[in-house]
UniProtKB/Swiss-Prot annotation:
Main function: Transfers and isomerizes the ribose moiety from AdoMet to the 7-aminomethyl group of 7-deazaguanine (preQ1-tRNA) to give epoxyqueuosine (oQ-tRNA).
EC number(s) reported in the record: 2.4.99.17
GO cellular component: cytoplasm
Gene (UniProt): queA
Protein name as it appears in the record: S-adenosylmethionine:tRNA ribosyltransferase-isomerase
Leading EC class: transferase
Source organism: Photobacterium profundum (strain SS9)
Compartments it resides in: Cytoplasm
Classification via SUPFAM superfamilies: QueA-like
Gene3D superfamilies, A to Z: QueA-like
Pathway assignment: tRNA modification; tRNA-queuosine biosynthesis
Catalytic activity: 7-aminomethyl-7-carbaguanosine(34) in tRNA + S-adenosyl-L-methionine = epoxyqueuosine(34) in tRNA + adenine + L-methionine + 2 H(+)
Length: 351
């Protein structure tokens, strides 16, 4: 398939630049993968769509204030966007500058030259940077970093984003983009799902800035996914196995939860074992033709045209069903992308 097969026209005004006043106030497009049937609902209806014995799998990554402004000691402004924390003192980052820093260059980061750092090495498009401070990278980012809002939210970050561009169940710092399907869940909805007999499990996938990179090939077979760190611990494996054994559904909240679970499933197939815990990097690329091992239902936001994420949704619900749902969403003025509305999709078998 061609990347252009996943294009759709999106009016600029449908890109959500701010979240709704309440997390659960978003709209929800329900798509039945088998038939392509569409129903228009509100996000609170997730409670009615869930069944006792279902397992909701959430991504508990925490977004770090990953964007830092500063300058080179030799002069010239720079903007640093953390891609990955390497250790307590070092990061791998994207750097925007009129002239890229070279190994050994001193950087002064923070609006008031708060922290000194050194450019250590370049790895393709990424820069390895080491801080010269008693504080850890996370402490420094919390102090001088900005929330890394996606490029299509064309406004500066605000204090409110520190709460709203974060899920209520975040636990493990490391992401530079939110697992956005989870932004719609508040504590009240989580408690109501629990009361209904729904079970929860938490994977970790630290979303990298690569999630916003455009696909730069024409044929999707030629695309190579960026790498992201994943944790699927033993308790998740146990919960998935128990749910399957009892006839419940695995409901992945977000494409990152899908990629985490399916990475673990692929790893088990490769090793010739049952599902086992998975800790490591994944470059899994899910597009039409992929056979899902674990996930039965997907809760996900509306994604960018020609992105790997709309390809994943097309693999899950069927290409025609997905593109038709997106056209209907545009016609019905759903809000798109990170702060936008959501979908509840049941898997189409043998897509």
């Amino acid at each position: 398939m061609q990347v252009s097969d996943f294009h759709f026209d999106l009016p600029n005004e449908l890109i959500a630049r701010y979240p709704q006043p309440e997390r659960t106030a978003s709209r929800l497009l329900q798509l039945t993968g088998e038939t392509g049937n569409i129903q228009h609902k509100g996000f609170k209806d997730v409670l009615d769509l869930a069944e006792s014995g279902d397992l909701f799998v959430f991504n508990n990554t925490r977004v770090i204030p990953a964007r830092i402004f500063g300058r080179k000691a030799s002069g010239g402004k720079i903007e640093v966007l953390v891609e990955r924390i390497l250790d307590d003192k070092s990061i791998l980052a994207h750097v925007r500058a009129s002239k890229s820093p070279k190994p050994g260059n001193e950087l002064l980061l923070g609006e008031n030259d708060d922290y000194q750092a050194e450019m250590i090495a370049r790895h393709d498009t990424l820069f390895e940077i080491r801080f010269n401070s008693d504080k850890t990278v996370l402490e420094i980012l919390e102090e001088v970093g900005h929330m890394p809002l996606p490029p299509y939210i064309d406004r500066p970050d605000e204090d409110a984003d520190k709460e709203r561009y974060q899920t209520v169940y975040n636990a493990k710092p490391g992401a530079v983009a939110a697992p956005t399907a989870g932004l719609h869940f508040d504590d009240k909805l989580m408690a109501a799902l629990k009361a209904k007999g729904v079970n929860f499990a938490f994977v970790t996938l630290h979303v990298g800035a690569g999630t916003f990179q455009p696909v730069r090939v024409d044929n999707i077979d030629d695309h190579h996914m960026h790498s992201e760190y994943v944790e699927v611990p033993q308790d998740v494996v146990d919960a998935v196995n128990a749910t399957k054994a009892n006839g419940g559904r695995i409901i992945a909240v977000g494409t990152t939860s899908v990629r985490s679970l399916e990475s673990a499933a692929q790893d088990a197939v490769k090793k010739g074992t049952e599902l086992v815990p998975f800790f490591g990097d994944t470059e899994i690329f899910i597009f039409p033709g992929y056979e899902f091992q674990l996930v039965d239902v997907l809760v996900t936001n509306f994604h960018l045209p020609e992105s790997t994420l709309i390809m994943l949704v097309s693999a899950f619900a069927g290409y025609e069903h997905t593109m038709n749902a997106y056209l209907q969403a545009v016609d019905n003025k759903y809000r798109f992308f990170s702060y936008g509305d959501s979908m509840f999709i049941t898997r189409r078998n043998n897509v």
